[in-house]
């Protein structure tokens, strides 16, 4: 479960590195100690559970091309208030199986999500918007600054 705070998210850029099949945020905000996993994409959190940035393995061979319309989102911080995660560990949020990944090459948008439709949209980190349904993450929208 997540809670929304009115503080502004960190600034930066979300990049895709083709040679590594990975996402990364530059510059990385400091303080990450653990992560939440969606597929193999990690949402880095600090000791207080605040989501800091997105990074991780996301091979473009697994993406399906689609026309996407990213949601209007409020810029805010998200805090994980679910079960405790040990320092250096990850907790998988989509335990029932991998979520589909859709990519819009025109807008450079990725959608990693379940089939559940959310009721809140929070831009919580550089290039990252969480789609929430009753406080649970149902979709991750990513806006790539560049694919290098």
Regions found by a protein language model. Give the residues of each.
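Mixed-charge, glycine-accented linear interaction segment located at domain edges/termini
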Residues: 118-148
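A structural detector for beta-sheet-dominated domains
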Residues: 46, 57, 113-115, 133, ...
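Short, structured motif recognition centered on aromatic/hydrophobic residues
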Residues: 42-45, 49-54, 128-130, 137-141
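Short solvent-exposed loop/turn micro-motifs enriched in small/polar/acidic residues
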Residues: 35-38, 94-96, 121-124
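Intrinsic disorder/low-complexity detector
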Residues: 1-28, 41-43, 51-107, 148
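Short, basic/aromatic recognition patches
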Residues: 26-31, 101, 111-119
